[in-house]
């Protein structure tokens, strides 16, 4: 069996190992069951999750078996890693809804047929867990002094860390123990911000089960300046087309900085590395061809080839190269809204997230109506603004929406 580790390292996925040499040997000699956890804090995955699913997909293509663990139980607490404040607690009904939505999305990326992958929810073993038994069985293996030295807790101690959140590491470690017992799961993969929690899981399995256990972390998706990628003017870049349209999704990748093209091609597509190197070596205006390939390939993986083609055609239409403008995200407005302030309509249509953000765009000259910059915050939308029953809104340099009269 070819060692997938070489592929993952060449493409820049791997950040840290618990046992690099043993991990390499294990992946060479057997089909390994591994897991990645996803907390259902929203009803859709976003781009930050997508890189984890690509990690899983590369492993699955190499013959290994993924377990996608949905944290229906741990979500009732909330992961303190990388957070400055305690997360708002969600109701069980909200968590159940989010779990159902995420399951449906995952099945687009990972092959769950014929036991090639497994989908589990840690609510199945955490929610009915006897607390005293849990402390005796799991808590005895954790040192409070060592836990407090973990990066995920150190960042929170000054602002206040609840005992509720302090339990998160034990629960995530217990997940690995349960999966090891039930499915012979030997490895956890996760984002680099999960390193402390993952080490705890590896050590729990090794101490309690006397079994080999390993962890690898995946690099986080950041740009050349070290900032997390996947944010738009409307918030996170979601994988749900109802939250982020395929066109807006396509345009995000079409407009990445030149310095980020190679990293994104490596991490977010299956394009062979020779072609990645060729595309990344393009200079000047030619790098735009690489960005088009990136945008199409990522959109195809997330939304399918048909939606990727529509998004590409819409972009070409808007930039004067022909194509079908019907694929530009469209909002239908009733005639009773004529005379309303443009910014109010844009907020209602979710074209801008808030009126304050709309005002900021206007102030910076970043909002246009039918090609004309909007200069007045209080500009109203009148019937005369509509050409053939529609107006074209432009946000920033390359984000377009249509408003049509219903």
From Swiss-Prot:
It is found in: Cytoplasm. A motif ('KMSKS' region) lies at residues 228-232. Keywords: Aminoacyl-tRNA synthetase, ATP-binding, Cytoplasm, Ligase, Nucleotide-binding, Protein biosynthesis, RNA-binding. Disulfide bonds: none annotated. Residues 340-404 form the S4 RNA-binding domain. Pfam families: SYY_C-terminal, tRNA-synt_1b. Its main location: cytoplasm. Belongs to the class-I aminoacyl-tRNA synthetase family. TyrS type 1 subfamily. This is Tyrosine--tRNA ligase. It comes from Clostridium perfringens (strain ATCC 13124 / DSM 756 / JCM 1290 / NCIMB 6125 / NCTC 8237 / Type A).
């Amino acid at each position: 069996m070819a060692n997938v580790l070489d592929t993952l390292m060449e493409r820049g996925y791997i950040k840290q190992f618990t046992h690099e040499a043993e991990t390499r040997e294990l992946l060479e000699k057997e089909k390994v069951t591994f897991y990645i956890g996803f907390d259902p804090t929203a009803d859709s995955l976003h781009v930050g999750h997508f890189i984890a699913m690509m990690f899983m997909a590369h492993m699955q293509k190499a013959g290994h078996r993924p377990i996608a663990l949905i944290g229906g139980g741990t979500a009732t607490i909330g992961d303190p890693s990388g957070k400055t404040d305690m997360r708002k607690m969600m109701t069980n009904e909200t968590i159940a809804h989010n779990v159902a939505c995420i399951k449906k999305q995952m099945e687009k990326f990972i092959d769950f047929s014929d036991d090639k992958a497994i989908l589990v929810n840690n609510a199945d073993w955490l929610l009915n867990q006897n607390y005293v038994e849990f402390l005796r069985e799991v808590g005895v293996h954790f040192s409070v002094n060592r836990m407090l030295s973990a990066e995920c807790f150190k960042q929170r101690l000054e602002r206040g860390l609840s005992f509720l959140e302090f339990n998160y590491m034990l629960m995530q470690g217990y997940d690995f123990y349960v999966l090891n017992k039930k499915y012979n799961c030997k490895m956890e993969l996760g984002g680099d911000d999960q390193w402390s929690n993952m080490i705890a899981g590896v050590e729990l399995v090794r101490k309690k089960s006397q079994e080999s256990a390993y962890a690898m972390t995946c690099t986080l998706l950041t740009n050349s300046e070290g900032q997390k990628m996947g944010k738009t003017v409307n918030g996170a870049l979601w994988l749900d087309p109802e939250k982020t349209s395929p066109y807006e999704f396509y345009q995000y990748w079409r407009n990445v900085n030149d310095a980020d093209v190679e990293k994104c091609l490596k991490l977010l597509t299956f394009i062979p590395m020779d072609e990645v190197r060729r595309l990344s070596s393009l200079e000047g205006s030619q790098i735009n061809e690489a960005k088009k390939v990136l945008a199409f390939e990522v959109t195809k993986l997330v939304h399918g080839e048909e939606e990727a083609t529509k998004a590409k055609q819409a972009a070409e239409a808007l930039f004067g190269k022909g194509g079908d403008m019907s694929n530009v995200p469209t909002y239908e407005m009733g005639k009773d809204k004529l005379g309303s302030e443009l910014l109010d309509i844009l907020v209602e249509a979710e074209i801008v997230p808030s009126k304050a953000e709309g005002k900021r765009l206007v102030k910076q000259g970043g909002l246009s109506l039918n090609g004309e910059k909007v200069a007045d915050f209080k500009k109203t939308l009148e019937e005369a603004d509509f050409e053939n029953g529609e107006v074209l809104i432009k946000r920033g340099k390359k984000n377009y929406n249509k408003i049509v009269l219903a």
